[in-house]
């Protein structure tokens, strides 16, 4: 019987130069597999807790305590167990932690081990990760949301909305869709440069210049789509991540880029005007995570027109999602494994969403690494959508390149962008 022989952890750097956990699992058959945990910038209040050292190293952001928890507390419980029972492994770590948000061991410690165990098990069985986790059902190569203009907490500019994304929905393959997206990205860079805008990049590889308001980035993206030779709405649509918790103050929404302070009703109307004017098919975190009344207003106004994605709202938590489903809040959920803390819990949330007709969008974090786990995970769970940044910066393209490999390797890959909306 193959069993877990050893578990190790190392402090490594993410794409923002901050420390994160790399966990390595060694099996008795000699299989070695590792996983690197991502980290977010705009985080929901109810996310699972990253354990940081809080000392002088790395401005308090070191993760040596989390690494120690992997090598001592977690390893003591898991060494000797079969790696092929993911649910059991994750349940043991959850019980060992004993809190509802992994504040004892750290979600960065637990998730690192959870991912590494899954990868080791797949490798030991000579299976690709997506096939190991998804079985024969994992056939949909997800339609990407590519964040090509960054604002909010992801950039040092005066744009309030955090992400302006393109969705290449009108193509027959992921390969074609990614090519179109890259061409649009490069065209956008030229357009910005021609107008005297700096083309510095934000955390997720998108451009981050200043604009006169929150609508101007959409105009630039539409120009780039057309100039690159593609058709807005027919081939390429627009998705937004407002990350509105970041500009929610005292029950109001402060849009500094537009010099406006809006109520939830007024903000919903602001979005409705954008949706009527532009080919916007998806809006993430349109209201603040604590403003459930605002979410109800937004869902009633736009829920039958576009995809309304809860990120900070649901934090990949099945209990919170169940409450949202019961109250008719949003119609889609962003899936970030490090928000909930383990592979198994992520899968449970996805299954709940899919059973109730909520779309799922697999997602990276702004602090990423070369680890492409979520690419396989998206295919395994048939999320049909993935959000992993611009077609630039190695930690972003690692996911896209892995999806290209998966599409090539699948016997009958499905790219269903045309059917999403």
Curated annotation (Swiss-Prot):
Annotated localization: Cytoplasm; Secreted; Cell surface
Example GO biological process: glycolytic process
Details of cofactor binding: Binds a second Mg(2+) ion via substrate during catalysis.
Enzyme Commission (EC) number: 4.2.1.11
Keywords in alphabetical order: Cytoplasm, Glycolysis, Lyase, Magnesium, Metal-binding, Secreted
GO CC field: cell surface; extracellular region; phosphopyruvate hydratase complex
Binding site for (2R)-2-phosphoglycerate: 162, 336, 365-366, 387
Main localization of the protein described in the UniProt heading: cytoplasm
PROSITE patterns linked to this entry: ENOLASE (PS00164)
Active site (catalytic residues): 204 (proton donor), 336 (proton acceptor)
Names of the cofactor(s): Mg(2+)
InterPro entries membership: Enolase, Enolase-like_C_sf, Enolase-like_N, Enolase_C, Enolase_CS, Enolase_N
Keyword Secreted assigned: yes
Binding residues for Mg(2+): 241, 284, 311
NCBIfam families referenced in this protein's UniProt entry, alphabetically: eno
Family: Belongs to the enolase family.
HAMAP family in alphabetical order: Enolase
Protein name (record): Enolase
Organism: Nitratiruptor sp. (strain SB155-2)
Gene: eno
């Amino acid at each position: 019987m193959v069993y877990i022989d050893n578990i190790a952890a190392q402090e490594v750097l993410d794409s923002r130069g901050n420390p994160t956990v790399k966990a390595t699992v060694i099996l008795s058959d000699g299989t070695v597999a590792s996983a690197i945990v991502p980290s977010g910038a705009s985080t929901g209040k109810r996310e699972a807790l990253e354990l940081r050292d809080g000392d002088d190293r790395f401005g308090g952001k070191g993760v040596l305590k989390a690494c120690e928890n992997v090598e001592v507390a977690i390893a003591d419980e898991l060494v000797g167990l079969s790696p092929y029972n993911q649910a059991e492994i994750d349940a043991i770590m959850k019980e060992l932690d004993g809190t509802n948000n992994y504040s004892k061991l750290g979600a960065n410690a637990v998730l690192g081990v959870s991912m590494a165990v899954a990868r080791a098990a797949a490798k030991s069985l000579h299976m690709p990760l997506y096939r190991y986790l998804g079985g024969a059902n994992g056939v949909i190569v997800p339609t990407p949301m590519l964040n090509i203009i960054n604002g909010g907490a992801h950039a040092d500019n005066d744009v309030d909305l955090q992400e302006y994304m393109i969705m290449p929905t009108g193509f027959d393959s992921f390969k074609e869709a990614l090519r179109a997206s890259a061409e649009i990205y490069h065209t956008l860079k030229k357009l910005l440069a021609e107008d005297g805008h700096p083309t510095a990049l934000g955390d997720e590889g998108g451009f981050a210049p200043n604009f006169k308001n929150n609508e101007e980035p959409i105009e630039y993206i539409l120009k780039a789509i057309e100039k690159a030779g593609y058709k807005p709405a027919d081939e390429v649509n627009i998705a937004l991540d407002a990350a509105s918790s970041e500009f929610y103050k005292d029950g109001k929404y402060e849009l500094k880029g537009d010099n406006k302070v809006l109520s939830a009703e007024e903000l919903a109307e602001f979005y409705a005007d954008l949706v009527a004017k532009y080919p916007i098919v998806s809006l993430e975190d349109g209201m603040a995570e604590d403003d459930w009344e605002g979410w109800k207003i937004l869902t009633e106004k736009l829920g039958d027109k576009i995809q309304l994605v809860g990120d900070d709202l649901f934090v990949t938590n099945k209990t919170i999602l169940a409450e949202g489903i019961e109250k008719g809040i949003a119609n889609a959920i962003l899936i970030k494994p490090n928000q909930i803390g383990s592979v198994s819990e992520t899968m449970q949330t996805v299954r709940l969403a899919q059973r109730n007709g909520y779309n799922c969008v697999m997602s990276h974090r702004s602090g990423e690494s070369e680890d492409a786990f979520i690419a396989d995970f998206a295919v395994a769970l048939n999320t049909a959508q993935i959000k992993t940044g611009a077609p630039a910066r190695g930690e972003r393209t690692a996911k896209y390149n892995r999806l290209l490999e998966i599409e090539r390797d699948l016997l009958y890959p499905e790219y269903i962008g045309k059917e999403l909306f």
